[in-house]
């Protein structure tokens, strides 16, 4: 599986994303012509060296004075450009995310009345259209982003002095569920435009996924920093058998909870969205019998599941083991009909495939097979075997 991984150790801006993707192999001539045909700008692309790292610097030359554009006006510019459908959809999606972020910050529910200042200029339009075209041209199966260095300090903008990250940028970080951190540089390293492009295309990662590097690209930023002001991107070939997924593991010890309470908690955690739950017997200090409760969850479900564990068990706290990058097979549920003792029954079967569609495993749904076993008098193990055989004939 081919993946694009952005590594924003010096932040990200629209022109840095554009430069990075062009350096990775997107067609420079095609993207440049597309930008200049869509927006009243000229584009210069050149190689520079930033603190010892060669990078691609993209300069968008715009008219000296431009009017502030509204959200509908920006959409009109994109639609009038006659872009390829995938590029147009991405550009509109990015501006939609920007609009929602600005609306949330300013308390303006009517997007039609939103005025864009910095992100409404032609250079931002060019960055968004160009980055969308370049990313699509790389033909990746997926796009990811490692933790983002947002910078620190304050910035001056149309609404006055704002903290870093700017409020709209922070909303976009929230929307994309990105990991981010401050830095020693007293500058804005992640711009709203950069954040919006990443939020549209990329999923969050805490660290690089397992895979092999195909190519590396660097997009140059404008400012001179203490380190290289570049956005690093890599095209990687991930393990074709598996698909990346982000999880967190919750864990706590419970030494004064009955089996009935633990059984109920087990069911409720699964109903609330836990990916898996394990309750293990343990011995604590002074020989007290206890249980270790472990829960696998998506990051967005961690807080509510942790609260549920505390409320139900009386535990004083829940450990959240640092987010892990796991690899899993793509799974789907199918129904199959099969014969048992002359009678036709139906059962769900879980089918696992890799990203290339190769069958990895089939597993009959236990609860369905248990009901069939009770009705037919056949051992549940035999019922499961028959269900899986029927599934193999249909889906192999």
From Swiss-Prot:
InterPro entries referenced in this protein's UniProt entry, alphabetically: Ni_insertion (IPR002822)
Q: Which Pfam families match?
A: Ni_insertion (PF01969)
Keyword Oxidoreductase attributed: no
- Keyword list, A-Z: Nickel
* Keyword Methyltransferase annotated: no
Cysteine pairs bridged by disulfides in the record = none
Source taxon at top rank = Archaea
For this chain, one GO molecular function annotation is:
nickel cation binding
Q: What HAMAP family does the annotation carry?
A: LarC
What the record says about family reads: Belongs to the LarC family.
Q: What's the protein name?
A: Putative nickel insertion protein
What's the source species for this entry?
Methanosarcina barkeri (strain Fusaro / DSM 804)
Q: What is the lineage of its organism?
A: Archaea, Methanobacteriati, Methanobacteriota, Stenosarchaea group, Methanomicrobia
């Amino acid at each position: 599986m081919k993946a694009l991984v952005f590594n924003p150790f010096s932040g990200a801006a629209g022109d840095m994303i554009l430069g990075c993707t062009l350096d990775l192999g997107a067609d420079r001539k095609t993207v440049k012509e597309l930008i200049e045909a869509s927006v009243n700008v000229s584009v210069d692309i050149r190689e520079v060296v930033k603190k010892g790292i060669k990078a691609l610097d993209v300069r968008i030359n715009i008219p000296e004075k431009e009017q502030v554009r509204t959200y509908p006006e920006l959409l009109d510019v994109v639609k009038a450009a006659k872009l390829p459908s995938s590029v147009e959809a991405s550009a509109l999606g990015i501006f939609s995310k920007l609009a929602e972020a600005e609306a949330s910050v300013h308390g303006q529910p009517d997007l039609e009345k939103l005025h864009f200042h910095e992100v409404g200029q032609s250079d931002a339009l060019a960055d968004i259209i160009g980055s969308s075209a370049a990313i699509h041209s790389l033909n990746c199966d997926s796009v990811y982003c490692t933790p983002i260095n947002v910078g620190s300090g304050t910035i001056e903008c149309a609404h006055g002095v704002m903290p870093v990250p700017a409020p709209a940028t922070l909303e976009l970080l929230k929307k994309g569920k990105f990991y981010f951190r401050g830095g020693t540089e007293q500058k804005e390293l992640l711009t709203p435009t950069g954040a919006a492009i990443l939020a549209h295309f990329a999923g969050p990662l805490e660290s690089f996924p397992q895979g092999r590097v195909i190519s590396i690209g660097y997009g140059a930023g404008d400012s001179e920093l203490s380190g290289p002001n570049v956005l690093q991107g890599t095209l990687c070939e991930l393990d074709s058998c598996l698909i990346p997924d982000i999880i967190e593991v919750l864990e706590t010890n419970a030494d004064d909870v009955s089996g009935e309470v633990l059984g109920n908690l087990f069911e409720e955690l699964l109903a609330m969205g836990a990916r898996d739950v394990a309750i293990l017997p343990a011995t604590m200090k002074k020989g007290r019998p206890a249980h270790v409760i472990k829960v696998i969850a998506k990051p967005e479900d961690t807080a509510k599941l942790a609260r549920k564990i505390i409320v139900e068990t009386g535990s004083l706290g829940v450990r959240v083991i640092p987010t892990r990058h796991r690899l899993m097979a793509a799974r789907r549920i199918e129904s199959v009909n099969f014969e048992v003792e002359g009678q036709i029954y139906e059962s769900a079967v879980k089918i696992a495939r890799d990203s290339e569609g190769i069958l990895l495993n089939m597993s009959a749904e236990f609860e369905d097979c248990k009901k069939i076993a009770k009705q037919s008098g056949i051992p549940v193990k035999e019922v499961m075997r028959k269900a899986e055989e029927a599934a193999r004939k249909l889906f192999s």
